[in-house]
Amino acid sequence: MKLGIAIPHYGPALSSAADLRRFAVEAERLGYVTLWCGDRLFLPTDLQGDYPGTDYPIYAERGNRFADPLTVVGTLAAVTSTVRFNFSTLNAPLYHPVILARALTTLDFLSDGRVDAGFGLSWMRDEYDTLGLPWSQRGARLDDVLSFLHAWWTTNPVEYEGQGWSFPRSQVGLRPVQPGGPPVYLAGVTEPALDRVGRRATGWLTFDAIPPEVRKTMWAEDGVDEALVDFFFTHTTMDEFLEAAERVADLQLR
């Protein structure tokens, strides 16, 4: 098992740039394998819906102070040398594929190949509405992003026909350090999301326990060996461990 930790780049935990840098350096020293960033453009005071899987709102004080994840990773890559960076998740459909390709390739270059690309759809419809993007097409937009990134990272010159846009045949001089580009990890627990993981990703970002037989059946249909898919549980709790530690400590103090 490998352990990662979330970067405190949002909410009250975001205190200063110096604290962020110290956090990254110390996490690397302690042996964490990956530092994780989230992605949120804004959080309306009147949301159109609650966070998936809950019946409570995500309060604005957590989301009204959210540093740009791409900028944060670039900053922290400069003060570290071994720890990797990933996103849980970067809401890929909200970005134009060309802008995202350049940004991720730049981060891969600046970090000497220590960046992974963790993508999700964003659960918040308000973000799509504000950017003028169709909520119903979010899955198709993610597929478009994935296809363009693959083209950008594996071909040169690059030419691409997207959904309602095109990229003219062009030489792309800045190439990724990692062969084939940063590894792609996808989030989601729905059937379309799991199907996309099996077809298009190196690994799966999950916070839910999907029955193994369901995963294996779906991925087998795509010819995917589950053993080759990396699993990242992006939300974990230490409650049971803390309770056990407290019981042991109590015994020692008696």
Labelled PLM ranges:
Residues 1-254:
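Active-site-adjacent structural elements that line small-molecule/cofactor binding pockets in enzymes
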